[in-house]
Every structure is written in C-alpha cells, then in structure tokens.
C-alpha cells in the first residue's frame, strides 16, 4: 500500500462533472460516485498537473515510484516556452495527439454527444466568446478556438495551444506575466531572430511541466522531477497483461507460496477505471472488459493520453508493432504561416513536409543493428533484418 494514484480533493473553484448524467450513467453507472469508485469529489485538473508541475514535492507524492530531478536549464518547460519568455519554443506536438483527447464527458471528438458537441470545421476556429473561464487555477481565454472548449482535464493539463494563458506569476516584471501566447506567424511565440528555423511548427506544445509561477526571464522556476516510473503505469501494465492472458498463470513466490493470475474482467474494470475517474472521465463496465480486442484498443488510447510527453509512446509503438503506421503518417498541425488576421486559415489542419518534419519508419527500425565489430568476433551471429 505504499503507492497509489495522486489526487486532491475538490475545491471551490474546481470544475463540476458533466451535466449529461443520464447519458454517462449508461456508459459508467458508478461515474457520479465519490472517487475512487466514481469520479466525484476530486479536482481532476489539479490531481493531474500537481504531479508534474512541482506543486507537490516528489518525496510526498505516492504516485512516483522512480523519478529524477530535471535541470531547469534543459527541461521540457524550456523547450516548450516561447523565446520571448526565455524558452526555445521548439517542442511541437502533432494534430493526431490533439485530436485523441476526448470531450469532457469522455466521448471522442468524432463521436461527441449532443450536450458537449465538437464543433464543425466551418466554425471550430471561432472564439469561444463570453468571459474567460477559470477553474482549478487554470484560465481558458475567451479568445480560445471553440475546438478546444469542453475537452477533458488532461487536455488542459498537457497541451499548450494558440491563445493559451501563461501566468508566470513569479516574474518581477509585468511584461513576462499573464501572457496570451499565440502561434501565428506574427504572434507572441514567433521565432527567435537569431535562429529563424527554431520555432513551433504545429501550433501545439507541452505544458505538462509548467507551474503557474514559472517564469524564466525575471522570475523563478519550480523544481520538478521526471516520472521515470509512476503508479499509473503499474495499473495500466497490469490491465494490459491480464487482458492478454489466455490461461491462468501461477507464480512461485520467494516465501514458497503461490500466486495465480488469470484473465479477470473485474480487475480490468477496477484498475482501468481508477485512471479514467482520476482524469474525470467515465470508465468501462465488465461487459466492455470482456472484449479483449476492445480493451486492447482502449489501453492503447489511455496510455497515449495519460503518458503524453513522458517518453512512453516511443516504446509502446514498437512493442505493439504499431510504429510503421504511426510514424509513416504525415505530421500535421495548425498553419503557423498564417497571420493573426487569418484565423480560419491558421486553424485549418495543415500537413508539414519540410526537412525538419518529414519522418519515415521501416521494418528494420524495430531493431538496432548489431555492430560489425561484434559480428566479426562471432561468425555465428546473424545481423538483424534489413541491416546489411
């Protein structure tokens, strides 16, 4: 019982659960129960962002199993922050990832509900309008595109997008705090004049490791730790393992006892839903858990979102055998060549095809080549496929 998912209780400024209760209860009857049985009673945004932003010291965070401290001079925050805020502005996230984040009621954007619809392409670029939305210390500006409204808490805890709000509250100078960051060609996050090729090419970046106080010019940066291994991965690893089991498996323990592990839909539901409920989203039922293929795809989705910008997807795509499809798909994002008076053009999904964004993956890339010096020492060794 040493490790568990980190969560923080609901506060006065926490966002309420989705209001389409009847619709969600058909998906997850326990959703409106208190956490961990359901998703009620916790602050989903803070429960996610406090783990990475430095708000909660790693020594008292029960989710961190292994971690390492990140240097403030060379960290995801520096890579993501705009040049004008002391960063490099070159950490790009792709449109595929953005579109994978669900709506606040757990529906995919292409299957959104009537209560929380994903806007049509003819209007998705328009401003949300009205007053700025504030919840859990996060500010969603009224100038934000409608396509980013009513998305799941992990979206706001992870993704920096055009018209994102960067508080930088520790700054001693107003010019570096409370900044509306835009990625238009004439926007706030435009390129460093000394390095014109070093700019954000997709209009999306990672804010997972950003604290509200962080400001690198005239302020301070919170100490942060990178999650080498955290309890959320233990849970999803276990769910994936028992989903793939075809027959019971018995382990001999050091004390002479035996432990038998088998395909268990109740465990799949219990531990998968811990992750979903912490994120403020509906879980699954045992009826869904009984479908191995369905659960496999759900796990792939959940790992992509839960561990975004944590270095897990590199290995996941390879062990699943999905890397060729994923990496040979063109990179796309916003049209960052558009100016601020060309809003619709900016938000039109654009394929990137220059020397810095082209990528390819062939079968041989699943393996490393065996060095020639090693092959020369042992004539019985055979080089890995396609490495000649």
Spans of features found by a protein language model:
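Internal, charge-rich low-complexity segments
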Residues: 2-17, 105-113, 170-177, 246-253
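C-terminal substrate/ligand-recognition segments
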Residues: 128-275
């Amino acid at each position: 019982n040493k490790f568990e998912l980190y969560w923080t209780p609901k506060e006065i400024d926490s966002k309420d659960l989705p209001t389409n209760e009847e619709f969600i209860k058909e998906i997850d009857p326990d959703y409106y129960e208190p956490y961990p049985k359901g998703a009620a009673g916790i602050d989903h945004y803070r429960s996610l962002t406090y783990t990475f932003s430095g708000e909660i010291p790693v020594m008292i965070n029960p989710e961190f199993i292994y971690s390492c401290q990140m240097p403030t001079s060379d960290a995801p925050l520096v890579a993501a922050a705009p040049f004008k805020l002391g960063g490099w502005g070159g950490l790009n996230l792709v449109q595929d990832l953005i579109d994978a984040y669900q709506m606040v009621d757990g529906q995919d954007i292409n299957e959104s509900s009537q209560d929380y619809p994903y806007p049509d392409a003819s209007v998705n670029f328009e401003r949300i309008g009205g007053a700025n939305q504030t919840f859990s210390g996060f500010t969603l500006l009224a100038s934000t595109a409608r396509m980013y409204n009513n998305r799941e808490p992990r979206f706001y805890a992870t993704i920096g997008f055009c018209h994102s709000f960067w508080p930088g509250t520790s700054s001693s100078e107003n010019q570096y705090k409370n900044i509306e960051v835009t990625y238009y060609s004439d926007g706030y996050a435009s390129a460093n004049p000394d390095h014109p090729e070093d700019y954000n090419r997709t209009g999306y970046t990672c804010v997972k490791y950003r604290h509200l106080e962080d400001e690198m010019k005239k302020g301070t940066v919170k100490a942060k730790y990178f999650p080498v291994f955290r309890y959320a991965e233990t849970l999803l690893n276990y769910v994936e393992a028992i989903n793939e089991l075809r027959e019971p498996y018995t382990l001999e323990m050091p004390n002479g006892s035996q432990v038998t592990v088998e395909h268990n839909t109740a465990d799949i539901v219990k531990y998968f839903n811990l992750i979903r409920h912490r994120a403020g989203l509906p879980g699954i039922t045992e009826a869904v858990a009984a479908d191995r293929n369905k659960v496999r795809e759900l796990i792939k989705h959940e790992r992509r979102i839960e561990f975004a910008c944590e270095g897990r997807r590199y290995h996941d795509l390879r062990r699943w055998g999905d890397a060729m499809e994923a990496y040979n798909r063109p990179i796309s994002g916003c049209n960052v060549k558009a100016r601020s008076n060309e809003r619709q053009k900016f938000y039109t999904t654009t394929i990137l095809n220059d020397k810095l964004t082209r990528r390819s993956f062939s079968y041989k890339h699943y393996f490393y080549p065996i060095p020639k010096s090693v092959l020369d020492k042992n004539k019985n060794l055979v080089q890995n496929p396609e490495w000649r």
